Amino acid sequence: MLRVAVLSLHTSPLVQPGVGDGGGMNVYVRELVSALAHAGVDCTTYTRTWRDDLPAEVMIEPNHKVVHIPAGAIDMPKGDMISIVPHFTEGVLDHVNAHGGTDVIHANYWLSGLSGHSLKHELDVPLVSTFHTFARVKAEGGDPESEFREQSETEVIG
């Protein structure tokens, strides 16, 4: 059975859309992973622990579970999460290694892309990245992001 590690560092597919950073990406990740799970793909979505009362793992449906990785303060703003990417990455790596590995990584958003880029080299598996937004495109629309983000996206794309 194909095993996919789905990365969604800054927002969980369990978050209600419209709450905090919950929105289209949450719905996208949850629905994509659900479709893969129904097709017989073993999917684990890794997200940052976003509430104190969350279990370490939540089984959503057969072949689809969410794993909460403790990384940073519960109420950490998305703009500060670059600092926790290494800690999140280490937590994902530990879980993946403890549970038999993965065949492919699918990262969502640029922060998860940075984590996935490190993990693909550590685990020697392919990385698929869905950025959802790009710094370069946002800048063209008058909403500039950091130069670091743009450089990071370029590195992940390779």
Task: Describe each region flagged by the PLM.
Residues H95-S112, G116, V125-V128:
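Short N-terminal targeting/anchoring amphipathic segment
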